[in-house]
């Protein structure tokens, strides 16, 4: 066909394919078979290949994925994407309603399912999709336009030539998640923990073709500039978005009272497992925009909305065995082996049993029906036994008397609940020490994870951490899935680790009771490994937060010939043994806003790791703790901050975003 014919046919195909795509991906009512859709798509691809100038921004071929990007650009949100305060029970919801009515009188609410995905912003100009971005810190996100184009339920052109900015949740349906993990397992790749992580990881791929292959979906749940468009309520905004061609979740309800809201919440607590996607709660918003304006917002969240979070999901499965593992300090830990079961979006086959006393107290037996939940929706644990299901075939479990790895006798030290293997040459302990030494919190050797360490250990290439610094490229390329480039990268990472500051090495050595914070304090105080090795118990206890038990452990470690030999080897290989940080002085903390403050970190910081942030806080005289309480002074919230941020808001604790934190660091360094 000539160019004019091609132009007409391309326009026809775009109209057909966009309509068929809307019917399939948004309405879920396809009017043509998949084969016909594919045939028309191939015809359009062929025309656009022959006549590239005929390609338009709303062409369905743009969803296939363009060339890889070098990096994501930063995007400043015109209207901040605020997080929501949380409710965990009916009382919290009634308190929210009481606050709303005290301020604005009677109010209607809109209840929507809280999709467990990634919050995004999508911007249109004259009806055409021009930019999409992640939420980021609420003010600044990342430009993921090309990846969002691959989501077929997101319109590239609206039904009206309107300019707007909509907010939505990109997610991975359960079926897509299962299929993706099956494919990754077949290729020997690491599995995604849950659909939310899979969706977030897919949208942060620099290659849009990867995102296109992941079969993501998107529900739009809000309009940033609704009032500019003359829309007066949230429910009207959702209807308008739907009329423009957006996919809006039909499972929503306008409620006149808080009792109706609670009924909706309870309804979806029961119906949640039936959905083809994961939800983790219900979002409740005041419907009237006028009332929303009257209610206003705090620094982080609107006062006119709240997110009800479902309680941690509990499921019942069968305990088919108990496996005993040996950690790097010799502690022997029992782990439940379970019939695979879905819990909070992931398939669980293993769960912690803590120790022998826990098993005895719960009377947990092999063959029992056990109750599983995820602590914090992350770590699977056995919380109880369904005794009524016992049929007499269950077998009580007895902890072994000897190490499952080296056959050494296990002992229980005074005051401890764990059994321990005291053999310093135990293969399991050596392997776990290597994994710990290379970990991100310690020497941070990129590419040296558990699988590679196990291969190195099993091949006899390493027996202790000093052996890592003798590895050669020839040795590494002989390992499974280790090519020349990977070997070169790993050797470069090992070489780079030699320059780490003393606190990382000290933590990496795995001295009992010496965590990352204690390592930081010791390194800062003694400045060199030589001074630390020579320190007496009293000198160690003079360091803030170093108690008698830790001091005893440190002096015992440095008195062992094996430890002395290891440190001498590391020195020979050029591993740094000095503190590189800025030594704290009396003046330093006094000048800082963080001096003497108790600080909690939550969420992901774009500019530094969690440990680096912790180091900066401690350098400025602050103290980092892991949980929010009334004694917390400041919470520093990064991207995807969770329950800690919510609790801080409820307690009225000062909250910093990453920009505020960086400003304080910069001010102190001037």
Swiss-Prot record:
Its EC number is 6.5.1.2. GO terms for molecular function: DNA binding; DNA ligase (NAD+) activity; metal ion binding. This is DNA ligase. Keywords: DNA damage, DNA repair, DNA replication, Ligase, Magnesium, Manganese, Metal-binding, NAD, Zinc. One of its GO terms (biological process) is DNA replication. Gene3D superfamilies: 5' to 3' exonuclease, C-terminal subdomain, 6.20.10.30, BRCT domain, DNA ligase/mRNA capping enzyme, Helix hairpin bin, Nucleic acid-binding proteins. Zn(2+) binds at residues 403, 406, 421, 426. It catalyses: NAD(+) + (deoxyribonucleotide)n-3'-hydroxyl + 5'-phospho-(deoxyribonucleotide)m = (deoxyribonucleotide)n+m + AMP + beta-nicotinamide D-nucleotide. The gene is ligA. GO terms for cellular component: cytosol. The active site is at 114 (n6-amp-lysine intermediate). Residues 589-670 form the BRCT domain. NCBIfam families: dnlj, PRK07956.1. Its cofactor is Mg(2+); Mn(2+). Belongs to the NAD-dependent DNA ligase family. LigA subfamily. The keyword Nucleus does not apply. DNA ligase that catalyzes the formation of phosphodiester linkages between 5'-phosphoryl and 3'-hydroxyl groups in double-stranded DNA using NAD as a coenzyme and as the energy source for the reaction. It is essential for DNA replication and repair of damaged DNA. It is an enzyme of class 6 (ligase). NAD(+) binds at residues 34-38, 83-84, 112, 135, 169, 285, 309.
């Amino acid at each position: 066909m000539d160019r004019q014919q091609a132009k007409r046919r391309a326009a026809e195909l775009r109209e057909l394919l966009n309509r068929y795509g809307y019917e399939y991906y948004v309405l879920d009512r396809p009017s043509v078979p998949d084969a016909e859709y594919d045939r028309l798509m191939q015809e359009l691809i062929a025309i656009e290949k022959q006549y590239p100038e005929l390609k338009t921004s709303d062409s369905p071929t743009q969803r296939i994925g363009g060339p890889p990007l070098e990096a994501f650009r930063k995007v400043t949100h015109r209207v901040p994407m605020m997080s929501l305060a949380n409710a965990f029970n009916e009382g919290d919801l009634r308190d929210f309603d009481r606050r709303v009515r005290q301020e604005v009188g009677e109010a209607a609410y809109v209840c929507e399912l809280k999709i467990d995905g990634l919050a995004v912003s999508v911007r249109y100009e004259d009806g055409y999709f021009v930019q999409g971005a992640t939420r980021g810190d609420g003010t600044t996100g990342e430009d993921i336009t090309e990846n969002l184009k691959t989501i077929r339920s997101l319109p590239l052109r609206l039904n009206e030539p309107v300019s707007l900015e909509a907010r939505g949740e990109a997610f991975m349906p359960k079926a897509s998640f299962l299929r993706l993990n099956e494919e990754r397992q077949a290729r020997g790749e690491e599995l995604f923990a849950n659909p939310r992580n899979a969706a977030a990881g897919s949208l942060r791929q620099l290659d849009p073709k990867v995102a296109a292959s992941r079969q993501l979906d998107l529900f739009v749940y809000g309009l940033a500039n609704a009032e500019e468009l003359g829309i007066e309520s949230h429910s009207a905004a959702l209807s308008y978005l739907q009329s423009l061609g957006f996919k809006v979740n039909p499972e929503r309800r306008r409620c006149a009272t808080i009792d109706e809201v609670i009924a909706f919440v309870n309804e979806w607590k029961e119906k949640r497992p039936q959905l083809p996607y994961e939800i983790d709660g219900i979002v409740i918003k005041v419907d009237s925009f006028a009332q929303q304006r009257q209610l206003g917002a705090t620094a982080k969240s609107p006062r006119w909305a709240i997110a009800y979070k479902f309680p941690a999901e509990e499921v019942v499965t069968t305990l088919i065995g108990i496996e005993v593992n040996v950690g790097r300090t010799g502690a022997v830990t029992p782990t439940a082996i379970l019939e695979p079961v879905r819990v909070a979006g992931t398939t669980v086959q293993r769960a912690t049993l803590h120790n022998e006393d826990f098993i005895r107290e719960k009377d947990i037996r092999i063959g029992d029906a056990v109750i599983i939940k995820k602590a914090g929706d992350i770590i699977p644990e056995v919380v109880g036994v369904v005794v009524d299901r016992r049929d007499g075939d269950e077998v009580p479990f007895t902890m072994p008397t000897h190490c499952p790895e080296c056959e050494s006798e296990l002992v229980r030290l005074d005051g401890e609940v764990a059994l321990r293997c005291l053999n310093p040459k135990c293969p399991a302990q050596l392997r776990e020490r290597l994994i710990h030494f290379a970990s991100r919190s310690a020497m941070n050797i990129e590419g040296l994870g558990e699988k590679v360490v196990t291969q190195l250990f099993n091949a006899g290439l390493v027996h202790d951490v000093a052996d890592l610094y003798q590895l050669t490229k020839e040795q590494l390329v002989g390992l499974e899935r280790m090519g020349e480039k990977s070997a070169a990268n790993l050797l470069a990472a090992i070489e780079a680790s030699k320059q780490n500051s003393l606190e990382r090495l000290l933590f990496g050595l795995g001295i009992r009771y010496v965590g990352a914070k204690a390592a930081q304090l010791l390194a800062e105080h003694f400045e060199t490994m030589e001074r630390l090795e020579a320190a007496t118990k009293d000198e160690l206890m003079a360091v803030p937060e170093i108690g008698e038990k830790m001091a005893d452990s440190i002096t015992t470690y440095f008195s062992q010939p094996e430890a002395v030999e290891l440190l001498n080897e590391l020195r020979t290989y050029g591993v740094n043994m000095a503190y590189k940080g800025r030594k704290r002085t009396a003046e330093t903390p006094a000048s800082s806003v963080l001096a003497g403050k108790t600080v909690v970190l939550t969420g992901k910081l774009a500019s530094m790791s969690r440990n680096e942030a912790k180091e900066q806080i401690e350098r400025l005289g602050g103290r980092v703790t892991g949980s929010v309480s009334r004694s917390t002074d400041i919470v520093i919230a990064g991207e995807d901050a969770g329950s800690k941020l919510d609790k801080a808001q409820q307690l009225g604790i000062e909250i910093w975003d990453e920009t505020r934190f960086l400003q304080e660091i910069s001010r102190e360094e001037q």
